[in-house]
Design a protein with these regions (language model features):
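A short acidic, amphipathic alpha-helical/loop segment
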Residues: 116, 166-169, 193
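Short acidic active-site motifs
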Residues: 139, 166, 189-190
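Beta/alpha (TIM)-barrel catalytic core signal, keyed to glycine-rich beta->alpha loops juxtaposed to Asp/Glu
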Residues: 187-195
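Acidic/glycine-enriched edge-of-secondary-structure segments
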Residues: 70-76, 169-178
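Catalytic beta/alpha-barrel core
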Residues: 99-107, 128-133, 150-162, 177-186, ...
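Glycine-enriched alpha-helix->loop->beta-strand junction motifs that scaffold or abut catalytic
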Residues: 95-97, 121-123, 145-153, 171-179, ...
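Glycine-/acidic-rich phosphate or pyrophosphate-binding loops and their flanking alpha/beta elements
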Residues: 57-59, 167-170
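N-terminal capping/lid subdomain adjacent to the active-site entrance of alpha/beta enzymes
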Residues: 1-127, 132-141, 145-149
Length: 201
């Protein structure tokens, strides 16, 4: 329905939502099971605080676009040469400022691939990794802590997406590398618990 409303208004959905007043936007949300972490009044206050500089941010997004990242070079099974070539193409030709590599099958392969990727993209392009839930918590911590030399922006799905406490434990242990969840978040309750536990950042 939101997509239809945005199309009727002749604007992208992000802009339609961004132009709403905080109270109007919050009134569209269901806060059931959430108010121990965030009340509607607190949400309005957060959004009201975000109004500062909003016009400039919208102008920037309309002119430049929203920053994305490329997963093209990051698939497991690519030769080092193919991964490096794709990393250079995505960043130097297509202009991506971040790439993401899959990791988690073999630590030596991961270290080699990350070193080659970082060399190919240079220090100014962000590099992230995605483990696709392959590790338990101790393995994730051990493995990711070997990645600090590559200046990672974040690691996605280091363990089961249902393990909120595990993600929080990992996040504390690998700091300053951030933890991200993927597309597997099952409910707003889990999302709330992630926020309460500082399990991603």
């Amino acid at each position: 329905l939101w997509d239809i409303k945005a199309k009727r208004a002749g604007k992208p959905l992000w802009l339609l939502l961004g132009e709403m007043e905080p109270e109007e936007l919050v009134s569209t949300l269901d806060f059931r099971y959430m108010t121990d972490a965030l009340t509607p009044a607190e949400a309005v206050e957060i959004l009201r605080e975000g109004q500062k500089g909003k016009a400039e941010r919208i102008k920037h997004l309309l002119e430049v676009g929203y920053p994305g990242y490329s997963t093209a070079p990051g698939w497991l099974g690519y030769s080092d040469e193919k991964m490096v070539a794709l990393a250079k193409e995505e960043t130097q030709v297509k202009g991506f400022k971040q790439i993401k590599l899959k990791v988690g099958q073999n630590i030596d392969d991961d270290l080699r691939r990350l070193a080659k990727a970082r060399e190919a993209i240079g220090p100014d392009v962000r590099l992230a990794v995605d483990a696709n839930q392959v590790w338990d918590v101790p393995t994730a911590i051990d493995w990711i802590n070997k990645f600090h030399d590559f200046d990672l922006a974040w690691v996605e799905e280091p363990t089961s997406p249902d393990d909120v406490i595990g993600h929080a434990t990992i996040a504390r242990a690998i700091n300053p590398i951030k933890v991200a969840t993927g597309e597997q978040m099952q409910s707003r309750i889990l999302y709330k618990q992630y926020l309460q536990a500082n399990a991603f950042g």
